[in-house]
Amino acid sequence: MPPVSASKAKRDAKKAEREAKKAAAGKTIRKLGRKKEAAAEESEVDAAAREIKMMKLQQDKDGLSDRVVTGVLSSLETSRDIKLSSVSLLFHGKVLIQDSGLELNYGRRYGLLGENGCGKSTFLKALATREYPIPEHIDIYLLDEPAEPSELSALDYVVTEAQHELKRIEDLVEKTILEDGPESELLEPLYERMDSLDPDTFESRAAIILIGLGFNKKTILKKTKDMSGGWKMRVALAKALFVKPTLLLLDDPTAHLDLEACVWLEEYLKRFDRTLVLVSHSQDFLNGVCTNMIDMRAQKLTAYGGNYDSYHKTRSELETNQMKQYNKQQEEIQHIKKFIASAGTYANLVKQAKSRQKILDKMEADGLVQPVVPDKVFSFRFPQVERLPPPVLAFDDISFHYESNPSENLYEHLNFGVDMDSRIALVGPNGVGKSTLLKIMTGELTPQSGRVSRHTHVKLGVYSQHSQDQLDLTKSALEFVRDKYSNISQDFQFWRGQLGRYGLTGEGQTVQMATLSEGQRSRVVFALLALEQPNVLLLDEPTNGLDIPTIDSLADAINEFNGGVVVVSHDFRLLDKIAQDIFVVENKTATRWDGSILQYKNKLAKNVVL
């Protein structure tokens, strides 16, 4: 056999390699083909989940912001105050803020107000990502996402984040010295930050914050990957409070807290000595925490001094004066127009008419006083129902524990009842079983002993913290309700009216629900709840995401409803408006509170440890 040349040997080897790869590829393709069908459905779910995530982050498919902003820094680069002029904000082409101003002074605590869907969360995101020209030395933290799932316990998570923050500041000090020299004005606040962090006390201070937010000696050691979304939000909040950024942005921080934790957070934030911008729909909380208000209304940011009550009083006075000026000016305009019209061609009056027309033209050029645009007020309404004789819902000596923890009863020998006149508030710290009690009422959970009696015609309507999970966020509200209740009606106009009755109107009905605010999605859930025509309402944190006027409308609807109501809520003002009976859930039972909800709040405030 003649010898094979080296070049031919290489060619043969490459050919064999290609054939081997081809054969392997064929096997791979066959394997992939078998897996492809199984993975198809999963990949569609993943794609939908990613789409929803990107919409919530307000980013396009490439991860770029869907927001368009303008703003000019008017304060000094070295200042801890932030002053911006020419502030504008567009989201998906919709103007949210136009040519406005923003001033955030160090040490002040601002409440950001505005109706659902006006763009408060979008504005906070734009601030947090420095789409506005905020100096780099001002560190910013936005709380709008839970802590990441990890192997770290709640305590370790907060301490680790604090260590990262300390390292970040040390690196920034080093960078500032190299770039600006050791005399830089930026160094003093950085040294203050380092001193305030105090690594020797990391664990003890982190534990105080976590316990204040509702953790106990056991749950503080639980891994974040094993926590529910609500508890992960508390961990993220604890981290934010612990590292104390120069600019702290909190988007509805009380949404996942019980009354006790809300009181603790209110007391803590009262002492926050940096800059805070807070979105909250709890009037009581805003009154307790805020030194200033920013009203996001009519595409403008309007600043007010004082807390929410002070803002409400000042705004009412300003609007009253504005309407007086508007009416006076309109009378003057009508008088001028009437004179001009009556002047006709009379020679002696034509000159006067021209003079008055100039006055009118100047008034218009200078800008006429605009009438006050009233808030959009709509009324929640739960359909009236047939009255049922008592007992409608009764617990007789029940005891309950979860199967995963049979040695620890949540309830023992509990007696409790609900009838058509009930307006019951369940209060108490997280983990004592308030939501569990509602699930026992619905029959979702069954007690191990005792008896639960339900009237044969009772129809329970349930609103929970997880009610929004039923919504397909890739659909519009209009598409979703029509598809879900296709047996009721296929007519879009019918569903427009149904959603409109709960304050979701116009474009809010037709855009994908992932782009709606939490409050707007809540309105969809309430519209669905009303369709079921329940005669007893079980409401678990119904105010989450709702703006203050909407919460007032909800309170009115509950008071006008002729069925029974049981509410779990952290909103003291709602409970003050509706609760006739307050039951404190603790020590494995529910005990009637002899006093008002505000007296209960004062009791909690006395026990706060900071």
UniProtKB/Swiss-Prot annotation:
Q: Which GO terms describe its cellular component?
A: cytoplasm; nucleus
Function summary: ATPase that stimulates 40S and 60S ribosome biogenesis. Also involved in ribosome-associated quality control (RQC) pathway, a pathway that mediates ubiquitination and extraction of incompletely synthesized nascent chains for proteasomal degradation: localizes to the ribosomal E-site and stimulates VMS1-dependent tRNA cleavage.
Q: Name one GO biological process term.
A: ribosome biogenesis
Q: Which SMART domains match?
A: AAA (SM00382)
Region described as Disordered: spans on this chain? 1-43
**One Pfam family this sequence matches:** ABC_tran_Xtn
* Top-level taxon of origin: Eukaryota
Is Lipid metabolism one of the keywords UniProt gives this record? Answer: no
Q: Which reactions are catalysed by this chain?
A: ATP + H2O = ADP + phosphate + H(+)
Query: Binding of ATP 1: at which residues?
Result: 114-121
PROSITE patterns registered for this protein in UniProt? ABC_TRANSPORTER_1, ABC_TRANSPORTER_2
Predominant localisation class: cytoplasm
Outcome (variant: residue 346 to A): Abolished ATPase activity, leading to impaired ability to stimulate VMS1 activity
Question: Which compartments does it reside in?
Answer: Cytoplasm; Nucleus
PANTHER family named in the record: ATP-BINDING CASSETTE SUB-FAMILY F MEMBER 2, ATP-BINDING TRANSPORT PROTEIN-RELATED
Q: What is this protein called?
A: ABC transporter ATP-binding protein ARB1
Gene Ontology molecular function: any one: ATP hydrolysis activity
The top of its lineage is: Eukaryota, Fungi, Dikarya, Ascomycota, Saccharomycotina
Enzyme Commission identifier(s)? 3.6.5.-
**UniProt cross-references to InterPro entries, sorted A to Z:** AAA+_ATPase (IPR003593), ABC_tran_Xtn (IPR032781), ABC_transporter-like_ATP-bd (IPR003439), ABC_transporter-like_CS (IPR017871), ABCF_EF3_subfamily (IPR050611), P-loop_NTPase (IPR027417)
